[in-house]
Amino acid sequence: MFKFNDEKGQLKCSFCGKTQDQVRKLVAGPGVYICDECIELCTEIVEEELGTEEEVEFQEVPKPHEIREILDDYVIGQDLAKKSLSVAVYNHYKRINSMSKSEEVELSKSNICMIGPTGSGKTLLAQTLARILNVPFAIADATSLTEAGYVGEDVENILLKLIQAADYDVEKAEKGIIYIDEIDKVARKSENPSITRDVSGEGVQQALLKILEGTTASVPPQGGRKHPHQEFIQIDTTNILFICGGAFDGIEQIIKRRLGKKVIGFGSEVKQDELKPGEYLSKVLPEDLLRFGLIPEFIGRLPVISSLQPLDEEALIEILTKPKNALVKQYKKLLELDDVNLEFTDEALREIARKAIERKTGARGLRSIIEGLTLDVMFDLPARDDVETCIIHDKCVTEGEPPILKMKDGSEVAMTKPEPKESA
């Protein structure tokens, strides 16, 4: 039987027989020891056998047209954004595949910056992309990040979320997608560099630079702050696709000032470009982001800039009815489980869209409006068995009138709210 101790009482590796003095580390198991050299050798053997299988995962990246078609199933409008995202994502994973081959041309990484008002579909686009590609996906909020050494989250915690989404499979996480929301909130507070330290603005941008470009980062497995006596997870960010999104409130004014008044020809009149509100975002350039407060190095690591337009009335109506996860379909299904049909008139849908535009909440505000309209319906109808159909019309939205109920006996009545009981 193999001895785990030599004559001097030193521990030995159960595989190669080297003592603890001859190796860097011995890992103990129940009645067995293995050294770091044997671990490395075993890893190489396993990688050689399984490596070819792992490479197949990304051999068939969907073509840009295919990515765009799937995005159309979930996201309404934003055609230009979907087109640029499809190309950027396709090129990113094509680049990963090409890295395994020895080629003279080195392809650089193309992270994405999405600019658009709240509720325009930035997060949904990123989530749908991850679903299409079947890769780990994590969402991080830039507002909670601070420079290392200050109260708040370190930028490495973003990577931890991705590792957790990949069930701690680091190799899988290294080909994932990270969406950093509210990136505009880490803009420099003023255009001129300040002598005071900006730990939640420019400091965060500086901390994100290396991760965005590609580095081997040390991530604390439990999150939180680093301390020298803990083990770290090493993750290479070279092949992680970063998508940064934000509303960038006020950038339209910067673009307007840059476009300014243009003179065409000699002696011609000064002419002002007339664009509709929201169209200015499509004219955004890196210099506008610089004036907004992003540092040049940070802008340089986000080469693909994609702008999303504010959603108009027609787009919001389509969002309510067309996608696979459309809100109207969801609420119809919920009442269908109680054997009641739910219907929204075309005028009601239009008024819901108008209300969302008034509130300036975009698609995100649609759910709260419908929730308010259907609260009494969802509360009362499950207890009744005489109702066949519930119709929500435009007056329900504009004047707060009750929905119309079609009864099983063929009659139609307005839904009545139960009278509150008088307190004794």
Curated annotation (Swiss-Prot):
Gene Ontology cellular component list: HslUV protease complex
Alphabetized InterPro entries for the sequence: AAA+_ATPase (IPR003593), ATP-dep_Clp_protease_ClpX (IPR050052), ATPase_AAA_core (IPR003959), Clp_ATPase_C (IPR019489), Clp_protease_ATP-bd_su_ClpX (IPR004487), ClpX_bact (IPR046425), P-loop_NTPase (IPR027417), Znf_CppX_C4 (IPR010603)
The keyword Calcium appears for this protein: no
Domain ClpX-type ZB: 1-54
Pfam families: AAA_2, ClpB_D2-small, zf-C4_ClpX
Record keywords: ATP-binding, Chaperone, Metal-binding, Nucleotide-binding, Zinc
Coiled-coil region: none
GO biological process, one term: cell division
UniProt keyword Chaperone, yes or no: yes
Binding site for ATP: P117, T118, G119, S120, G121, K122, T123, L124
Binding site for Zn(2+): C13, C16, C35, C38
NCBIfam families to which the protein is assigned, alphabetical: clpX (TIGR00382), PRK05342.1 (NF003745)
Family recorded in the similarity comment: Belongs to the ClpX chaperone family.
PANTHER family: ATP-DEPENDENT CLP PROTEASE ATP-BINDING SUBUNIT CLPX-LIKE, MITOCHONDRIAL (PTHR48102:SF7), ATP-DEPENDENT CLP PROTEASE ATP-BINDING SUBUNIT CLPX-LIKE, MITOCHONDRIAL-RELATED (PTHR48102)
Stated role: ATP-dependent specificity component of the Clp protease. It directs the protease to specific substrates. Can perform chaperone functions in the absence of ClpP.
Assembly description: Component of the ClpX-ClpP complex. Forms a hexameric ring that, in the presence of ATP, binds to fourteen ClpP subunits assembled into a disk-like structure with a central cavity, resembling the structure of eukaryotic proteasomes.
The protein's name in its UniProt record: ATP-dependent Clp protease ATP-binding subunit ClpX
Native species: Halalkalibacterium halodurans (strain ATCC BAA-125 / DSM 18197 / FERM 7344 / JCM 9153 / C-125) (Bacillus halodurans)
